Structure formats: structure tokens, C-alpha cells
Amino acid sequence: MTIGALPPTMKAVVLEAPLKIAVKDVPTPTIQKPTDVIVQTTVAGLCGSDLHIYRGHIPIPLPITVGHELVGKIVQVGDEVTKWKVGDNVIVPFTATCGDCYFCKKGLMARCDTGITFGTGRGLEGCQAEYLRVPTADTFLFPQPDDIPASTLLLMADILPTGYFVASGGKRLLMESLGQPMTGDLVKDVEGKKEGVCVVIGCGPVGLCAISSAVRMFDKVFATDLAPHRLETARRHGAIALPEEELKAAILEATDGRGADVALEVVGHASAMLKAIDLTRYFGVVSSCGVHSEPITTSGYMMFNKGLRFQWGQCSVPTYFPGALEVLRDNKEIFAKFIEKKIDFSQAEEYYALFEKNKIGKTVFVMGGEKDV
């Protein structure tokens, strides 16, 4: 089924080479398999993870349409799709997954046997375009709630579930280390009782999502960032946000000299990971969702001596979506301010350059100039 005939070409944000973005006319996607849908974009996000591809740190075939965050309307449906119909408004998580492999069945969709992140190649273009082909649509899309604007809901495609993932992973490992029982209900387990001191390294968009999640789980949440203007924003999300030179002393004072129970590393740089390790107490927890592209060098004996527990990796959005959505519902006004810029595709080259230089915060592309979405 379809809503009329789609145009043969569409506007798309294309990475032609590292640091070289262009807005081009490209072929409009079509249904390739009966489990596909075609989604017309309402809003598409510019995410910090996009910078790893933009800078050339992650090798992918070029040119390619970039982006992996999208909220939009289904305009075509494959013959074997059962959960969705033309006209449905949906949130598209950043990775297409099969729903049937070992990892998907365990709720670990980030490691799906056939999973593909939008805008990274392997036959799946990115979300920063007027239309998007979504494979295996019955397995990982979510309906768009009516009470939250599309631009705010875009956070649910990646960074808010990722923030919830990194915070809840730290809390679960802390509970495990303390021998506390868990029911298997993720939200109930990690939010049932606030406990422990947490520190978040990095107060960019993902860091703020981690902070808003962590304040539901821990007694105290500290945070730091090298960019001073981000600290005030982190405070609005509930953190005790301090410059790096003041952070360690404050954490030691709050913990009788032990260090943080849990550190959340969301930057993806070796210095941030080493900072997280340094601030964490003996037998504490480090939980990381940072995308690291360089080696991390540290002392094996120091690591042995600290006895830390680690969680590290990519978020399985469907598993963490329910908890993250409640964080969003309870903080709608804060997250509405989270979107700093609403732009159209014609401004992509300019805003990628600004985002790469850390001169702007969360930015979204909106279709048709509708800035109130």
C-alpha cells in the first residue's frame, strides 16, 4: 500500500568524503523485500555518533546518505508487514534488527546477527533524507505517542535509550556486586531504590540523557565536561556538575574518601575512560557507551588492584525504550529545550561543521520548514 506515488528523487544529506557534506538529489527508496516499509521523514537528527563517520574515524563506503535518528510517517508497506499500516507515525531506532536471532531473543539487539545501523553502508542508507527504507519493520519500530512533539521524540531513536542503557547498566552491576536481588524487570530493578554515588563523564547530548536517567537510580549524580557552558545544562538535568579540577575532591568528600560507586563514560575518548576509572572506588563499576576509535593505554596492575566491573558497548534500543520513554515523559519541558537548532537540509554542510567544532548542541532536520514539530 502507498500514499500516492512517491517522487522519483529526493533530497538527502550525503557524505562524499571525510569532512565533506553535500545535499544532493538521490533516488527515492523503494520496497525491496516484503518486510520493508518506506517512511517519510518528519524530523531527522544530527547525532554525536555521526561525527565519527563525518571525521572518517569509522571506515564506511562513500558516498552515503548519513544519519540514524528519525521520526516519520509510513507511506508504503510491504506485503508481509503485519504491525504497521500506511499513515502510522513511527519512531525509527538507529539499528535495523531481525528479531529472531540468538541476540535479538535475549534482548541484545545491538549485536543482531544481521543488524545494520542506518547510514553505515551494507545496503542501508541513512535517515537524513526525505524518505527512508526500513527493513524488518515489524521487529523494531515504535509508535509515536500523541502527547510528545516529534522533534523531542527523536531522542528516543538513539540517545535517550542510550543514556538509560549506560545508567541502568551501571546500576545493575552495582546491585549485583552488592548481592542485591533482581526481578528481571529492568525499570523496577534499577529505579526501585536510589543508592550509591554516580559520576557522568561528558555532558553532551548523550551525557545529559544519562544524567536524567541516573538521577532516578542513584543518591547523588556528579558530572563534568571540558566545555564550561555544558555544566549549567547538566545541573538543570539534576547533576552536581563541576569543572574537572574540582570534581575528584567533591566525590571523595561525598564518599568518605572511597570514590564513586559507578562512573558513566559517554565521550568515547581515552582520556574520558581513564578519568572514569580514576574516579571509581575499588570494586566499583564503569559503564561506557562512548564510541572509542583509538587504543586506551593503562596499567594492568592498577586495573587488577581496583577490581572494577565493566559494561561497555552499544545500546539495544528496544530493550531500554520503555524506561527511557518514562524519563522523557517525566522531563518533557527539560527535553523540549534540549533541541537547540531546527534546520532544513539546505543548511547541513554549515551545521555539520559547527557541530564538529562543538559550537552547537542537539540539532534536528525538519521537513518543509515546520519548526513547531
Provide a role label for each language-model segment.
Residues 260-266:
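Short SAM/SAH-binding signature in class I
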Residues 91, 264, 287:
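N-terminal Rossmann-like NAD(P) cofactor-binding module of classical short-chain dehydrogenase/reductase
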Residues 2-8, 274-278, 318-373:
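C-terminal hydrophobic helical "lid"/dimerization subdomain
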Residues 247-257:
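Short amphipathic alpha-helix with an adjacent loop that forms part of the alpha/beta core around
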Residues 148-249:
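Mid-domain Rossmann-like dinucleotide-binding core that forms the NAD(H)/NADP(H) cofactor-binding site
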Residues 27-44, 55-105, 125, 145-147:
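Glycine-rich beta-strand-centered segment in the early N-terminal region that forms part
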Residues 269-330, 366-373:
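Glycine-rich phosphate-binding loop and adjacent beta-alpha segment
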Residues 47, 93-142, 146-150:
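Cysteine-cluster motifs in flexible loop/terminal segments that predominantly coordinate metals
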